[in-house]
Amino acid sequence: MSLLTIELQKEKRAGVIPVLIAVGILGAAYALVNFFVRKNTLLSLPLAPMDVLLTQLYGTLLILNMFGIIVATCMIYNMEFKGNAVKKLYMLPVSVPKMYLYKFLILTILLLIAITLQNLALIKIGMTDLPQGTFELPTLIRFAAYSFITSMPVLSFLLLISSRFENIWIPLGIGVAGFLSGMALANFDLAILMFHPFVVMLKPAVAMSAQPDKSIALVALTETVLFLAIGFGLANYTHYE
């Protein structure tokens, strides 16, 4: 049995897979119900219909995704930390850094699935509820890709934190603190705040346009790779809480 298959079974048993799939389904349901209830109010806003569709619904979807990431990353090392099992892995013919990469890959794919489910709901809304001729599928795809990319630094950062601490309350506390501080700082247009992964994730939600910001996307990709590289490097060492 391959290490990837083992990881998939562990994440399913730990509840990681159901959590992020549920986030996708819940987000899609929220978008459909919210637009159905507030359709006239939303379409009366002084914004282009595509900007209304993407920016006015994305805030809550982002919060769902963010807390889904926080919960999933807190749970993903649960089995390894039981009975100090993670320390025993170093005595087995198992590559712990490779295991870390597989966890990152699984979380990334699950987040992508969740965002895809949510955007399928937005496509349905755009095709049936926006004024005739105003729905632009390429614009939605670009924004979906942008929101996925800007979410990755938080995922990469929290996986790193979760891998280093056995106490689940530490990554959970850091995740909640990151969310609260990110909410407080996201509206400030200061370059130094881009070092804050939660601020990066929140940027699409505070923008009034559905057009992706290439500089923010570049920062997000850089931070994702940086946190992944640090986590991969630290996985070679057995120092845990």
Q: Would you name each region that the model predicts?
A:
Residues 67-81, 156-169, 224-237:
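Transmembrane alpha-helical segments in integral membrane proteins
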Residues 76-108:
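Helix-loop-helix units of permease transmembrane domains in multi-pass membrane transporters
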Residues 1-9, 77-90, 144-169:
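Cytoplasmic juxtamembrane interface segments
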Residues 77, 86-89, 121, 125, ...:
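Hydrophobic alpha-helical interface/terminus motif in multipass membrane transporters
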Residues 33-53, 172-241:
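Terminal transmembrane helical anchor/hairpin motif
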Residues 1-24:
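Aromatic- and glycine-rich beta-strand/loop motifs that create alpha-glucan
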Residues 19-25, 165-183:
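Pore- or pathway-lining transmembrane helices of multi-pass membrane proteins that form conduits
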Residues 24-69, 101-166, 206-211, 215-219:
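Secretory targeting signals
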